[in-house]
């Protein structure tokens, strides 16, 4: 073999070895990069946690909040539960179908709903919560109210863990509800939540994402000033927004994640679905599942729903598509 041929063979061998090492290290690099990216995502997701009765709840997988309305006039007739059996069955159904939180409301916020006195709201809630606690003593419960004293009763007497307020702290004057806030003061419900030391759902009626972000930033700071640490944001679909504004907002809710707080979305069977498709709340389950899917893909951490089973299935499927390892009951 000539010296020239030997040199050529040596060069080819060296080239092949270099390629082998290059691709080997490239594989290791890509594998490690993928691992680091996944870990970074896990860390980001773990940032969203709330303290519920001494238990740390994380949002590595989205949670499902099942609705229990102890009212005679909520907009979706299928959600109205008044008798002892109806309330008990609904509580057990939410848990059996994989719901993480039971949200109890006694004041309908549908347009045109009659005013309910504070005493009547408390009476309805006491009845509903006593049945709930008998049936599901360990359930995580939120109370849907804008009234500070109602929130205090629910937390102190029945161990309710979360206050879900649709009035944006009373700042907005939702529907029939009077304003209890003046410029320069802290809203009464903010002060009550700080006193109770429970997580708080802050809902907005602002019609667009820009106004919402500005308002949320200010309101979150007020809550922080009072010592409220666990805050959940709700963009308030169906509240103070036109049909078009609701859908524009749905396309932009991921922008709320800049505030680094858990995001709750409640679009279950709402008019933004059936007004678009033609129908009513009863025929809006499919549309609800579609919008819940969009919400999850855009970063929703909690789905507030009437139909728990379908929402849990949506969470599982979207999680698989996103490559998440979900820890969902059921």
Where are these regions (language model features)?
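Short polybasic linear motifs
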Residues: 5-6, 26, 325-329
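Short, positively charged and aromatic/hydrophobic N-terminal segments
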Residues: 9-15, 21-22, 28-38, 42
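N-terminal amphipathic alpha-helix/helix-capping segment at the start of soluble metabolic enzymes
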Residues: 42-71, 323-326
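Structural motif
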Residues: 62-65, 230, 262
């Amino acid at each position: 073999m000539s010296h020239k041929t030997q040199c050529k063979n040596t060069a080819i061998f060296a080239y092949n070895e270099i390629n082998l090492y290059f691709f080997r290290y490239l594989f290791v690099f890509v594998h490690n990069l993928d691992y680091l990216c996944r870990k970074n995502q896990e860390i980001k997701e773990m940032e969203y946690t709330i303290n519920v009765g001494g238990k740390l709840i994380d949002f590595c997988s989205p949670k499902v909040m099942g609705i229990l309305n102890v009212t005679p006039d909520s907009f979706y007739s299928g959600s109205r539960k008044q008798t002892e059996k109806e309330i008990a069955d609904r509580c057990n159904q939410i848990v059996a179908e994989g719901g993480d939180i039971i949200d109890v409301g006694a004041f309908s916020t549908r347009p045109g709903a009659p005013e309910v006195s504070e005493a009547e709201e408390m009476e309805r809630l006491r009845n509903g919560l006593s049945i709930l606690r008998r049936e599901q003593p360990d359930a995580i419960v939120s109370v849907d109210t804008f009234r500070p004293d109602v929130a205090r009763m629910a937390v102190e007497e029945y161990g309710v863990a979360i206050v879900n307020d649709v009035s944006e702290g009373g700042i907005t004057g939702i529907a029939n509800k009077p304003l209890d806030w003046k410029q320069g003061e802290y809203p009464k419900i903010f002060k009550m939540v700080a006193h109770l030391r429970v997580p708080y759902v802050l809902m907005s009626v602002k019609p667009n994402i820009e106004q919402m972000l500005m308002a949320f930033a200010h309101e979150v700071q007020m809550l922080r000033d009072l010592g409220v640490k666990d805050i959940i944001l709700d963009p308030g679909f169906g509240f103070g927004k036109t049909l078009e504004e609701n859908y524009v907002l749905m396309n932009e809710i991921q922008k709320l994640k800049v505030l680094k707080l858990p995001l709750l979305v409640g679009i279950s069977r709402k008019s933004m679905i059936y007004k678009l498709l033609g129908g009513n709340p009863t025929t809006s389950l499919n549309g609800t599942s579609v919008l819940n899917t969009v919400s999850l893909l855009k970063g929703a951490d909690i789905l507030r729903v009437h139909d728990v089973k379908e929402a849990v299935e949506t969470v599982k499927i979207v999680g698989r598509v996103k490559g998440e390892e979900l820890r969902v009951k059921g």
